[in-house]
Amino acid sequence: MAVDSIIDYILTDHAVGELRRRGIRQQEIEGILKNPGQRLDLRPGRVVLQSKFQEGETEYLLRVIVDIDRSPAEVVTAYRTSKVAKYWREQV
């Protein structure tokens, strides 16, 4: 699976509010967009870019949902989750 970076993007109003509410910094989003650990297609025109990270002894994912069928791409929302096994797709 090719992992593409996204350089040119905007944050939707919804994304701005959710990032603030969830305590996620825009720099974290930019890091995932530039160098995602994994890209999954959700539906035509929408992808999730995600990367694993460690906090203490717990492994998490930061997932960024992006509409790529427009220019610039639009970050719809982002969130952290400890449910790595549910969302991470191992390469076979």
Regions found by a protein language model. Give the residues of each.
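Ribonuclease/tRNase effector modules and their secretory precursors
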Residues: 1-92
